[in-house]
Amino acid sequence: MVNLRPSAPLSRLLLGYAPSDARTRQALWWHWDERLAAILQGGREPAIMAIRLAWWRDVLVQGDEGKGRGEPLVDALRKPGLTDFDRQYIGRCVEGWGQIAGAEALSAEDLQAYAQGRGGGLFSLLAGQSSPAIVAAGGIWALWDLAAHLSDPELAAVCLAVAQDLLPDAQLGRSTVERPLRLALMVAAHDVQQQRIPIRGFGPRHYVRLLLASLTR
């Protein structure tokens, strides 16, 4: 059986806080985000990245049933039926990743567009709804996650600075479906507030932060 759960430690832990009726779908969205990230991580030519990102848009947004059939993740996402809401925010995720795919230099504006697209789109899909707070929270998480994977410390610092500007807008609601998002935000926001680059990604101190946040959020 194909494993369609995410591999990143934080997203795997967050699934434990998701409502049981939303957990499977949230796992698929986290896994899908990892698949998009993998497109950018192989040092490929920008044109190849663009083609592979466009494939996901064609399959999931444009509804090209001739593509993707038999691909386990595509089949799993299509099985319950993709709504207009899903397609809208899938498109935003793809556009967000496209903002940084193959870019030689990234401006604060590029990072803002990436954050709103990838992070805002993903968090909206995870919650099954969207709001300015959900988009801001997703943007903070996406910039924090990007900073953890950059070899350029100066660009990573810019990511955290852009994320800091989003903090006032990231006031998430108290619904159970948003709980994993609140916890992800708490983990990322702590580093963002301190402008501390998560050099090794999710580590022991983040795990402690997640546990503490889970007691109150």
Predicted regions and their residues:
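Acidic/His metal-coordination segments adjacent to aromatic residues that form catalytic metal sites
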Residues: 96-107
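Portal/gating segments that form or line small-molecule/metal binding sites
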Residues: 80-87, 91
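Short alpha-helix boundary/capping elements
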Residues: 60-65, 85, 101
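Catalytic cores of Mg2+-dependent Asp-rich isoprenoid enzymes
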Residues: 1-55, 66-75, 89-96, 111-217
